[in-house]
């Protein structure tokens, strides 16, 4: 029979799991998400999270507490009398009392193959580290940072064409299906848990904008993975030497290419750029204050020739 679930999530990544749980008949008794933030052109409108927008379309009660550590927050959580809580990129630490409240526990969907890439930015870090694969895992939560016992996992190969946005979307859909399967097993009493290994633990630190500048002295493959791991946000960038306005360019998608030259040197009229070893060809980019565009469109307005330089 369907479970009574509390859903806790915030960004776009979380929404498919919420929708799939509803589609498979589970009763979502409440949705917890982060409070709306100022948005719009002038920051004058409060913008609800993607999860809040989805929950309101479903007619599910939405809560946006600033903390879950008060007695009032705990009593409110307990009052929903949930069988379990499903947590997908909620963005707030759950205290032990909250974790203990649902009858069957709290279950988190994490976008990595734990224990690799515990923490805030597993999708970006997996690409930037040149990992061959990523994946999603469902774990029963404890008070540690992504240290809970693992219930289920699905793997996904990372290709050289994948950006962080591409991998995000693939894992979001894969994770939604995995959580549905996990809740079905939990409902049957057949969800088996396995402790995480203490070998191979790495931490996916939050992305800092200071990391975004491209180091052209690195090998082409490392440059490609750096670019794709930061696409679209915050966007890996370089500056076009000799350009007085809008010199900064975010590179959003590229491919490995043949060629050699001084790091950052433009090698031809197709935006092939030399790296410390090998070269990349830019496919998609964005100038400061402009919309993202294909490299071919950029070259119509800025006809770069061989010998130009990115720094």
Curated annotation (Swiss-Prot):
GO terms under cellular component: cytosol
The keyword Membrane is annotated on this UniProt entry: no
EC number: 2.1.2.9
Keyword Transferase assigned: yes
PROSITE patterns: GART
Sequence similarity: Belongs to the Fmt family.
Gene Ontology MF annotations: methionyl-tRNA formyltransferase activity
Any one Pfam family match given in the protein's UniProt record, by short name: Formyl_trans_C
Lineage: Bacteria, Pseudomonadati, Pseudomonadota, Alphaproteobacteria, Hyphomicrobiales
Binding site for (6S)-5,6,7,8-tetrahydrofolate: 112-115
Job of this protein: Attaches a formyl group to the free amino group of methionyl-tRNA(fMet). The formyl group appears to play a dual role in the initiator identity of N-formylmethionyl-tRNA by promoting its recognition by IF2 and preventing the misappropriation of this tRNA by the elongation apparatus.
SUPFAM superfamilies reported in the protein's UniProt record: FMT C-terminal domain-like (SSF50486), Formyltransferase (SSF53328)
UniProt keyword terms in alphabetical order: Protein biosynthesis, Transferase
Gene name tied to this protein: fmt
Catalytic reaction annotation: L-methionyl-tRNA(fMet) + (6R)-10-formyltetrahydrofolate = N-formyl-L-methionyl-tRNA(fMet) + (6S)-5,6,7,8-tetrahydrofolate + H(+)
GO annotation, biological process: conversion of methionyl-tRNA to N-formyl-methionyl-tRNA
PANTHER family for the chain: METHIONYL-TRNA FORMYLTRANSFERASE, METHIONYL-TRNA FORMYLTRANSFERASE, MITOCHONDRIAL
Protein name per its UniProtKB record: Methionyl-tRNA formyltransferase
């Amino acid at each position: 029979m369907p479970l009574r679930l509390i859903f806790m999530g915030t960004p776009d990544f979380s929404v498919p799991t919420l929708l799939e749980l509803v589609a498979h008949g589970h009763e979502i008794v409440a949705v917890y998400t982060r409070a709306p933030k100022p948005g719009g052109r002038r920051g004058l409108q409060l913008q609800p999270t993607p999860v809040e927008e989805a929950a309101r379309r479903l007619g599910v009660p939405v809560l946006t507490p600033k903390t879950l550590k008060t007695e009032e927050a705990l009593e409110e959580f307990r009052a929903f009398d949930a069988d379990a809580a499903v947590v997908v990129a909620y963005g707030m630490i759950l205290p032990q009392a909250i974790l203990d409240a649902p009858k069957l526990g709290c279950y988190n969907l994490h976008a990595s193959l734990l224990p690799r890439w515990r923490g805030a930015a597993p999708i970006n870090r997996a690409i930037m580290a040149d990992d061959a694969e990523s994946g999603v895992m469902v774990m029963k939560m404890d008070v540690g940072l992504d240290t809970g016992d693992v219930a289920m996992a699905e793997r996904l190969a990372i290709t050289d064409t994948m950006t962080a946005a591409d991998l995000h979307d693939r894992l979001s859909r894969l994770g939604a299906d995995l959580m549905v399967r996990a809740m079905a097993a939990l409902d049957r009493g057949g969800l088996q848990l396995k402790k995480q290994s203490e070998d191979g633990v790495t931490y996916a630190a939050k992305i800092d904008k200071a990391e975004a500048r491209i180091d052209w002295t690195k090998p082409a493959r490392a440059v490609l993975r750096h670019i794709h791991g930061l696409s679209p946000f915050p966007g890996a960038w370089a500056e076009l030497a000799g350009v007085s306005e809008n010199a900064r360019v975010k590179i959003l998608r590229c491919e490995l290419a043949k060629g050699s030259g001084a790091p950052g040197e433009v090698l031809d009229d197709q935006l092939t750029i030399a790296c410390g070893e090998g070269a990349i060809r830019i496919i998609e980019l964005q100038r400061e204050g402009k919309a993202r565009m294909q490299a071919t469109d950029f070259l119509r307005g800025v006809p770069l020739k061989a010998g130009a330089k990115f720094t």
